[in-house]
């Protein structure tokens, strides 16, 4: 299946489910089951309840989708000049 055939919708994450799945309510009031795209997992982009997301769906299965973009919330950004916390231990 080529990427041109995918449908894109915007929605809101309503529930975080086990195994990296999410319940998303689309702007047209349909509720679907979605999973995070591989690049989101690779870059450790966390998705929580209430986040605005863009979902790709196949025209053959309109009940499942892939989250490929999470919109940045305005209140979650760190202040300018703030240092990022390191995830490793210096020796």
Curated annotation (Swiss-Prot):
Residues 1-72 form the S1-like domain. Residues 70-91 are annotated as: Disordered. Its main location: cytoplasm. It comes from the Bacteria. This is Translation initiation factor IF-1. One of the essential components for the initiation of protein synthesis. Stabilizes the binding of IF-2 and IF-3 on the 30S subunit to which N-formylmethionyl-tRNA(fMet) subsequently binds. Helps modulate mRNA selection, yielding the 30S pre-initiation complex (PIC). Upon addition of the 50S ribosomal subunit IF-1, IF-2 and IF-3 are released leaving the mature 70S translation initiation complex. SMART domains: S1. HAMAP family: IF_1. The gene is infA. Keywords: Cytoplasm, Initiation factor, Protein biosynthesis, RNA-binding, rRNA-binding. Component of the 30S ribosomal translation pre-initiation complex which assembles on the 30S ribosome in the order IF-2 and IF-3, IF-1 and N-formylmethionyl-tRNA(fMet); mRNA recruitment can occur at any time during PIC assembly. Belongs to the IF-1 family. Pfam families: eIF-1a. It comes from Azorhizobium caulinodans (strain ATCC 43989 / DSM 5975 / JCM 20966 / LMG 6465 / NBRC 14845 / NCIMB 13405 / ORS 571). One of its GO terms (cellular component) is cytosol. It is found in: Cytoplasm. GO terms for molecular function: ribosome binding; rRNA binding; translation initiation factor activity. InterPro entries: NA-bd_OB-fold, RNA-binding_domain_S1_IF1, S1_domain, TIF_IF1. The keyword Protein biosynthesis applies.
């Amino acid at each position: 299946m080529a990427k041109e055939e995918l449908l894109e919708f915007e929605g809101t994450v309503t529930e975080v489910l086990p195994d990296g799945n999410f319940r998303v309510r689309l702007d047209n009031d349909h509720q679907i089951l979605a999973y995070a795209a591989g690049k989101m997992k690779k870059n450790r982009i966390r998705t929580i309840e209430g986040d605005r997301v863009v979902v790709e769906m196949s025209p053959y299965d309109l009940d499942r989708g892939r989250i490929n973009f999470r919109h940045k919330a305005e209140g979650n950004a760190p202040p300018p000049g703030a240092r990022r916390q390191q995830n490793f231990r210096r020796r």
